[in-house]
Regions:
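HIT superfamily nucleotide-processing domains
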Residues: 1-134
């Protein structure tokens, strides 16, 4: 089953890509918990992390610090949370492994249940800012 992530990876759907290498992609979340909320995903469409070879899990997670640092620099966030859900009972919405990087800000409390829908222009501006922070 082709997911929205597979369509973005294949260039069939637009995505706000902040990082890409041969095997991975990081994109801004279209429905962020807070500004800069991003997703790091393997290009191979594994549904759950338990399906991935250990070395690919290690490669995926090894990208998180560099991507998180760029997000923090670009957004002014002071901290971040990492989340990775497996299965719909764990609230995995898209059946393609992805790691959430959720920036946290000193001056506001972020609610995990309340998401804001930014415009494409806002996402594009933020994408450029993060990409320039690598």
């Amino acid at each position: 089953m082709a997911t929205i992530f597979a369509e973005i990876i294949e260039g069939k759907r637009p995505g706000f890509i902040i990082f890409e290498d041969d095997n991975h992609m990081a994109i801004l979340d279209k429905y962020p918990i807070d500004t800069g909320h991003s997703l790091v995903l393997p290009k191979i469409p594994y549904e759950k992390i338990t399906e991935m070879p250990k070395n690919e899990v290690a490669e995926l997670f090894s990208l998180v610090p560099e991507i998180a640092n760029a997000i923090l620099k670009a957004t002014g966030a002071v901290a971040f949370s990492i989340a990775q859900n497996n299965g719909k009972e764990a609230k995995q919405i898209i059946p393609h492994v992805h790691v959430h990087i959720i920036p946290r800000y000193a001056d506001k409390a972020t609610l995990w249940t309340k998401r804001r829908i930014p415009s494409d222009d806002e996402l594009e501006e933020l994408r450029q800012k993060i990409k320039n922070s690598f």
